[in-house]
Amino acid sequence: MTKFVFVTGGVVSSLGKGIASASLAAILESRGLKVTLIKLDPYINVDPGTMSPFQHGEVFVTDDGAETDLDLGHYERFIETRMKQANNFTTGRIYQSVLEKERRGDYLGKTVQVIPHVTNEIQEFIKRGAGIGTPDAVDVAICEVGGTVGDIESLPFLEAVRQLSLKLGPNNSAFVHLTYLPWIAAAGELKTKPTQHTVQKLREIGIQPDALLCRALHAVPEEEKEKISLFTNVAEWGVISMWDVDTIYKVPRMLHEQGLDGLICDKLRLNTPPANLKRWDDLVYETEHPRGEVQIAMVGKYVELSDAYKSVNEALKHAGMQSHVRVKITHVDSETISDDNAAQQLAQYDAILVPGGFGSRGVEGKISTARYAREHQVPYLGICLGMQVATIEYARHVAGLQGANSTEFDPATPHPVIALITEWKDEDGTIKTRSENSDLGGTMRLGAQSSDVQPGTLAHSIYGDVVTERHRHRYEANVQYLDRLRSAGLVISALTQREHLTEIVELPQSVHPWFIGVQFHPEFKSTPWSGHPLFNAFIKAAVEHQKPAAKA
């Protein structure tokens, strides 16, 4: 039978529920349990696909094409289980499902209400995410409830998990509550009152936490833990300190040493071997003992919020560990770059990365960035839009196609080397269509798709014969211009297996040591254990470029 752990948060948002949930999952997985994670988001958007990265950080894409919360990226980087659409749902998706059932007459004329219809639907979605009744059923499903206890948006989710816990019966569910202990500098002490109040609010709803994860700058003193235990009705060994650390990969060891996994296994009556966190210890050692450092310029438009490029940042760090170097990432606003100042802005970096994005703002700066990297032999990795701007730059300045552009940025361009694809097939063979007038939500080429890689190319040395990666984009390289670009020397090194759409472009290594653009998003498949072959190769190229002979 699948057991459940429900993770909630109080006092303030952004405490790290995702990291805490993923860390607990990693420890339980090291005990030999099959684990999955589910994220419940209380906002009314159907998914985060149309939300600004400034609002919500990056959109993480799963193999099955779901646009999900960035926490699912943490989940995949911490445990072996791959996430699916069922692992993330929102208030919007719940209401969408309830209303569809109401229109079909599934409720047999009843008045549709939050309780029981919405809360029942939430419970069904949770069970679906845990794979109950299928071969994918897990031993433990950890459900992270987004938002903060006390917010009106979270109430249906909290009521639903309370009811589900009751239905599951004793020893089949546990509650973990993440809270915050502010440090008052003037008084020189941690304050526990907000924690007392948030647990009180949770208990008013009918939920008694089994463990408290107390976020603070430093480890919480024992006397404060005793006080928290007394006023929250949580056993003292269930009051666990979570202090700030310099790498998130220290959190599993931190929680294990304070007995969180033992407490959960005892509550859920799980008889397992002891946790083995050696690979986490090795990972932390690698991050703390680099043998060098490389400087990477990430040129984008959402640079004010690092979470907008969360998976890219993590993939670069993973690749650094594979090459035993620390990767120092500098986010450069593409709006500040032009042909005139690109050298001044970018000369100090060992490699340049242009990540994905949407809209025309800052695009010319990205095109100037690609030109600088091409002309100055700097390793360049373009992801999604980064590939497209590299293609536009090459068309303008090498292929002689003056005014070349994407129809996304200039619908009247004389040379639309990047254009909207109107029909394609998904991995399962489903035909999809779209136009300029299509809704923004759910109308992109999404999820894992495979491409054939041309032998003798840089891409082939990285991927082999076939590459399968995740996608999230509307615009593609225009097939009508591929022959002209090839004639001008651009290598089209990978095409999709069905529509023969461009997936990878590169420069011959006789012309440039390492210049590649990919239409997909490789960052979503990087893990701290092995990195990702494309990012690993990119960081190796940065290390090579750093050598004096390469600079000369």
Curated annotation (Swiss-Prot):
Active-site residues from the entry: C384, H521, E523
Activity regulation field: Allosterically activated by GTP, when glutamine is the substrate; GTP has no effect on the reaction when ammonia is the substrate. The allosteric effector GTP functions by stabilizing the protein conformation that binds the tetrahedral intermediate(s) formed during glutamine hydrolysis. Inhibited by the product CTP, via allosteric rather than competitive inhibition.
Entry GO MF terms: ATP binding; CTP synthase activity; glutaminase activity; identical protein binding; metal ion binding
Entries under SUPFAM superfamilies matching the protein: Class I glutamine amidotransferase-like, P-loop containing nucleoside triphosphate hydrolases
Positions of the UniProt region annotated as Amidoligase domain: 1-270
Keyword list, A-Z: ATP-binding, Glutamine amidotransferase, Ligase, Magnesium, Metal-binding, Nucleotide-binding, Pyrimidine biosynthesis
Residue span of region Disordered: 432-451
Enzymatic reactions: UTP + L-glutamine + ATP + H2O = CTP + L-glutamate + ADP + phosphate + 2 H(+); L-glutamine + H2O = L-glutamate + NH4(+); UTP + NH4(+) + ATP = CTP + ADP + phosphate + 2 H(+)
Binding site for ATP: S14, L15, G16, K17, G18, I19, D71
Binding site for CTP: S13, D151, I152, E153, K191, T192, K193, P194, T195, Q196, K227
Miscellaneous note of the record: CTPSs have evolved a hybrid strategy for distinguishing between UTP and CTP. The overlapping regions of the product feedback inhibitory and substrate sites recognize a common feature in both compounds, the triphosphate moiety. To differentiate isosteric substrate and product pyrimidine rings, an additional pocket far from the expected kinase/ligase catalytic site, specifically recognizes the cytosine and ribose portions of the product inhibitor.
Function: Catalyzes the ATP-dependent amination of UTP to CTP with either L-glutamine or ammonia as the source of nitrogen. Regulates intracellular CTP levels through interactions with the four ribonucleotide triphosphates.
Quaternary state and interactors: Homotetramer.
Protein name: CTP synthase
